[in-house]
């Protein structure tokens, strides 16, 4: 049985917050409010059953769970960006050039 995916927005918020160790900077990067980032992190923490950050007066620190998952998330997002770039590329047309005598081209090749 397939395991359900975690919410992508929550994972994006977590990865950005982990990189910046700051909800406000993560929010700026994602063009959302710091409250929205905090809400997504709380949702993710509820789903995984434990804290991803230790919230301190001087900032955020990753828990062991948070620290161990960040490299995998970064790799996953890099792969998604690569796949997105590949899908956005216009398809390359394969072009074949042939050279034939003009009489052969007009009487035999072009009618086909």
Task: Indicate residue ranges for each PLM-predicted region.
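A short LG(V/I)-centered, amphipathic sequence patch enriched
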Residues: 45-62
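Short helix-boundary/capping micro-motifs
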Residues: 16-31
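Interdomain hinge and pocket-entrance segments immediately C-terminal to HTH DNA-binding domains
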Residues: 87-106
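Short alpha-helical "packing" element that flanks the helix-turn-helix/winged-helix DNA-binding module
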Residues: 10-17, 69
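Alpha-helical linker/hinge and terminal dimerization helices associated
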Residues: 47-48, 69-90
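Core residues of bacterial helix-turn-helix
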Residues: 29-30, 41, 48, 69
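Short helix/strand-capping hinge loops at secondary-structure junctions
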Residues: 20-22, 48, 56, 111
